[in-house]
Amino acid sequence: MRCPFCHFVETDVIDTRKLYEGEVIRRRRRCRACGRRFTTYERIESVSLMVVKKDGTREPYDREKIARGVRTACYRRPVSAAAIEQLVNDVETAIMNTDEHEISSQAIGDAVMQRLRDLDEVAYIRFASVYRAFTDIGKLREAVDELLDREGVRNGHLSPKPAEDS
């Protein structure tokens, strides 16, 4: 592995850890020339998957594009980087398990929204406002109302949960 600081090609691995249930390996390395340390990540290379966009064009699947969208939606929200990474991993796993060589951008967006709804409601609304391209405040309000109905919240108050039979 080439050192990002001095570009020397020989480095030593000083620590290795599995992340995200073994889906990613994190390696801490030290350059043999300059002695500086850096981190690398290893993951399975994704298959050649094409994303079919709304206008019919196709582009290669890009995990980082999903991660950027989720990070933007979660900006200044109490969502950890690890939670965002796990969400992206979950979406990617769902996409790869379809065994298709093409997937619509809508299917990817729906998978992200489904998981964001459970992670952070404000991030969900932020993502939905861009993904669904709300054209007016009424559409945004519908999305918020849908979320509130799902959570049992109306007019700022929690709706009572149904009584459980003992």
Curated annotation (Swiss-Prot):
Pfam families: ATP-cone (PF03477), Zn_ribbon_NrdR (PF22811). A zinc finger (unnamed) spans 3-34. InterPro entries: ATP-cone_dom, NrdR-like_N, RNR_NrdR-like. The keyword Nucleotide-binding applies. It comes from the Bacteria. PROSITE patterns: ATP_CONE (PS51161). Its cofactor is Zn(2+). Residues 49-139 form the ATP-cone domain. Negatively regulates transcription of bacterial ribonucleotide reductase nrd genes and operons by binding to NrdR-boxes. PANTHER family: TRANSCRIPTIONAL REPRESSOR NRDR. This is Transcriptional repressor NrdR. It comes from Chloroflexus aurantiacus (strain ATCC 29366 / DSM 635 / J-10-fl). The lineage of its organism: Bacteria, Bacillati, Chloroflexota, Chloroflexia, Chloroflexales. The gene is nrdR.
